[in-house]
Amino acid sequence: MTVRTRFAPSPTGYLHVGGVRTALFSWLYARKHGGRFILRIEDTDRERSSMESVNAILEGMTWLGLEYDEGPFYQTNRFSRYREIIEQLLASNHAYLCYCTREELASMRAEQMARKEKPRYDGRCRERHSPREGVSPVVRFKSPLEGRVVIRDLVRGMVIFQNNELDDLVLARTDGTPTYNLTVVVDDMDMGMTHVIRGDDHLNNTPRQSNIFYALGKEPPVYAHVPMILGPDRQRLSKRHGAVSVMNYREAGYLPEALLNYLVRLGWSHGDQEIFSVAEMIKLFDIEDVNQSASTFNSEKLLWLNQQYIKNSAPEHIAHHLSWHLGQLGIDPSKGPDLAAVVKAQQERSKTLLEMAHNSAPFYREFEAYEETAARKHLNASVLGPLRDLRERFKEAQSWVAPALHEIILATVESHHLKLGKLAQPLRVAIMGRPISPPIDVTLELMGQATTLARIDRALAWIDHRSNA
């Protein structure tokens, strides 16, 4: 048997971290077992679905590297198939037409609640054989009245539902459009899904869907219901906790592999290991090892993990992702120093690629103004002489590499009887516009001789102007 898993989001909003974790678990399970991973877009809610959301899902999957083997398949292209199955269920007496009006259903619900009963459809149309004039019917599934449904869940173990507690769910609305519980069964059946990994908010749908499978003469797939992700307040993760689109994490400067690593550890672990390559995830992950209890999303832990990935990844890999962020700032990284070298100079301290992009910008374009506090502190008349001397030494430099530049700075400091910081910091502000940069000799090598001289000239002119103002 070839393992077949799927990710089936609804394009009614952004792709959030809970959905990504579900997709990741399904993808890892398929990859671990040499199976197939299918992407299905459940877009039957035409009012709320949008192509913008579809594109956001596809973009997110691509950025994360969760490549799918088949799809994307769209449910709106399969309405004729759903109608065919509805007719089959009606013909086999596993479904029936229900003519109850909304008012009648509301009255039924109110009476049941008054009797402190669980609200549910009472089946009054199960054996109705004549249409009701002026009423468009829905199609309901004729749920078994006896027996039980046993779900052998890979995460939760054996879960048992009594059929007499399940009501007759709607399969098709009055306008003929199919409902979720029908479409998901037909799709999983037609697409040969062997394993369905999804959030545990779907657990109560599982016995209903299983009964539809049985009515169609098919065995349901193996299910695994993973617990939800909670915010720090132990409430379900939402926008107020930062549960934004996965692409917002890209915009904030997170690496895709850092986000995947963080999400795989929400509910799953392998000893005390914190950091996993994608290859290690595929090798070690097992859906049966996922915890049953909910996990808490910790933004600080994600940030720490992102920092570790930035620090320890190949500079060329970081540069590939950093180039996108520089592009967002209107910077073409091909017009300047080697981007991998710029990355290497900053990897040790950068927490996000967004931070690194802003810190890298002065290497590729002139900064608009000096950081005011730093300029007032470091660019003053007392450094005019040392800076002019340093500029002349730089102008005559025969080798523009960090060790040689370091020696030039030391020689200048000694000749003016200064401590290194008294010249290095003004130089840093002059070159970068701010008091923070990689080591000053490395910064100068990356900046290049011509740009370094031009920026020292700019700083000298700025100091002169302030001194004479």
Curated annotation (Swiss-Prot):
Motif ('HIGH' region): 9-19
Record-linked InterPro entries: aa-tRNA-synth_I_cd-bd, aa-tRNA-synth_I_codon-bd_sub2, aa-tRNA-synth_I_CS, aa_tRNA-synth_I_cd-bd_sf, Glu-tRNA-ligase_bac/mito, Glu/Gln-tRNA-synth, Glu/Gln-tRNA-synth_Ib_cat-dom, GluQ/Sye
Localization per record: Cytoplasm
Molecular function via GO: ATP binding; glutamate-tRNA ligase activity; tRNA binding; zinc ion binding
EC number, as in UniProt: 6.1.1.17
A GO cellular component entry from the record: cytosol
Cofactor(s) the record lists: Zn(2+)
Residue intervals passing through the bilayer: none
Keywords: Aminoacyl-tRNA synthetase, ATP-binding, Cytoplasm, Ligase, Metal-binding, Nucleotide-binding, Protein biosynthesis, Zinc
UniProt-annotated binding residues for ATP: 239
HAMAP family according to UniProt: Glu_tRNA_synth_type1
Assembly and oligomerization: Monomer.
Function: Catalyzes the attachment of glutamate to tRNA(Glu) in a two-step reaction: glutamate is first activated by ATP to form Glu-AMP and then transferred to the acceptor end of tRNA(Glu).
Family from the record: Belongs to the class-I aminoacyl-tRNA synthetase family. Glutamate--tRNA ligase type 1 subfamily.
Name of the featured protein: Glutamate--tRNA ligase 1
Organism: Nitrosococcus oceani (strain ATCC 19707 / BCRC 17464 / JCM 30415 / NCIMB 11848 / C-107)
